[in-house]
């Protein structure tokens, strides 16, 4: 009996996830090696990676316009790409966990950050930035936040994350989110 494209859809989804993982790992590696690179080399590599994300975004757009069975499964990837392109999230690891819809790992990362802050291994500014990113990602994944987390998010969410949150909520449909991501890519290129 024919699989009616289920095997192919599964393989395509796996390939897309691997491509997104590779690009997010590339961004994360770039941030980790930032001190070792000169400014021009860093900027050029980051620009190339964002261009690759843009091309990946265009591919997703084409796939979604022709295959509606993938729409729900790809929407998380689209939001992650949109966040990376608009640079709302600065932490590639958070983007990757968000794209893979892994709230448990996001919460584990949050606990590790709390511990690192207490022992002085993580600076307050970086902690605040990453905690806001993780809490925003958890909220977008439909996770319930504690009152303390909501208060922290309200007090510390910047304009960029607020804009990402508003846009992703208002748009809803994959096509509109992809259109916004494409717009952000074009804006970044200029």
From Swiss-Prot:
Task: Give GO BP annotations, semicolon-separated.
Answer: response to ionizing radiation
**Where does the record place a coiled coil?**
2-63
What's the domain of life for this entry?
Eukaryota
Q: Does the keyword Coiled coil apply?
A: yes
Record lineage = Eukaryota, Metazoa, Chordata, Craniata, Vertebrata
Gene this chain is encoded by: LZIC
Q: Which UniProt keywords apply?
A: Coiled coil
InterPro entries xref list = ICAT_dom (IPR009428), ICAT_sf (IPR036911)
Query: Quaternary structure?
Result: Does not interact with CTNNB1.
Its recorded name reads Protein LZIC
What Pfam family is a match for this entry?
ICAT
